[in-house]
């Protein structure tokens, strides 16, 4: 190979590597900037969610567990809160170090034979930018033991999981950022028409992961939406999991959740459903005196 040919080859290699690095850099930038669009909250949204009250909604629950339908209660609590990014906890008061989030506390209570189940999940979604949830937690308690799972949104999804089951025990892992089933509920309350539809990867509901003892990872799924008069249905169907989630909500603001269904390929034979009973707007954290116990009757929780 003569000197001219060698120089030409080296130059082509440098150009090729430069183009490749440039392309990779652009992809990284695009990925880093994906979903960082500022949220343009409407005046109606702010008047509703920034009024110092929460929405507490109770649901009649039919939960499938161990192949049988169990009667129970579900509660969805949506509230706007100040959030500390570094500590990733609710702040005692808003400050220059906080930003607003929409928090969902979702609970389920039902019994399996002699012993009770209690499930609670919390999802914190920013109200400043259209990004992923900043934190998700999930816990289950029953007489055999308890589990706890937490995701912190850092440079990646940092997940810690603890379980009394053999083979699960204590786990710590890092996942690439992708859509979380848990965060979809908040997104549907903020702006249901901005949900990304079509085939995509999702991390399933944390309580589903724990109850079904499946690996903590993203699974291929398809998200669809269908409007029927005054109701919007959002459907999540997982390709390699026997799971379909249908969420029904009002098309009118504040887009309240009317019911949801969790189905399998067996249809009605393995069918979880929660249907709205009552919905209240109140500062529930100030209602912890026995004199406010009647509010549980109002929510039909007793």
Which functions belong to the PLM regions below?
Residues 15-18:
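C-terminal motif of bacterial Sec signal peptides marking the signal peptidase cleavage site
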Residues 151-200:
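Surface-exposed beta-loop interaction hotspot
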Residues 20-22:
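Bacterial signal peptide processing site
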Residues 24-155, 194-302:
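Acidic, serine/threonine-rich low-complexity disordered tracts
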Residues 1-7:
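Bacterial N-terminal signal peptides that target proteins for export
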Residues 8-13:
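N-terminus-biased targeting/localization segments
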């Amino acid at each position: 190979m003569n000197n001219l040919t060698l120089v030409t080859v080296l130059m082509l290699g440098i150009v090729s590597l430069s183009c490749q690095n440039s392309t990779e850099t652009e992809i990284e930038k695009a990925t880093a900037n994906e979903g960082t669009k500022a949220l343009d909250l409407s005046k109606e949204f702010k008047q509703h969610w920034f009024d110092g009250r929460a929405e507490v909604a109770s649901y009649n629950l039919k939960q499938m567990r161990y192949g049988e339908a169990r009667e129970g209660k579900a509660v969805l609590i949506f509230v706007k809160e100040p959030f500390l990014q570094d500590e990733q906890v609710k702040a005692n008061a808003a400050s220059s170090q906080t930003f607003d989030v929409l928090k969902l506390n979702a609970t389920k209570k039902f019994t399996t034979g002699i012993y009770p189940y209690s499930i609670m999940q919390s999802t914190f979604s920013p109200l400043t930018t259209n990004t992923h949830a900043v934190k998700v937690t999930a816990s289950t308690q029953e007489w055999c033991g308890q589990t706890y799972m937490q995701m912190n949104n850092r440079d990646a999804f940092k997940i810690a999981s603890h379980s009394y089951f053999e083979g699960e025990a204590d786990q710590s892992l890092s996942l690439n950022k992708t859509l979380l089933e848990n965060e979809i509920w908040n997104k549907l309350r903020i702006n249901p028409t901005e949900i990304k539809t079509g085939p995509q990867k999702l991390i399933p509901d944390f309580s589903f992961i724990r109850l079904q003892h499946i690996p903590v990872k993203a699974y291929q799924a398809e998200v669809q939406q269908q409007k029927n008069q005054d109701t919007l249905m959002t459907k999540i169907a997982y390709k390699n999991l026997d799971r379909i989630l249908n969420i029904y909500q009002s098309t009118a603001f504040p887009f309240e959740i009317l019911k949801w269904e969790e189905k399998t390929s067996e249809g009605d034979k393995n069918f979880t459903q929660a249907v709205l009973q009552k919905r209240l707007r109140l500062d529930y954290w100030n209602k912890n005196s026995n004199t406010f116990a009647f509010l549980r009757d109002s929510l039909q929780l007793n």
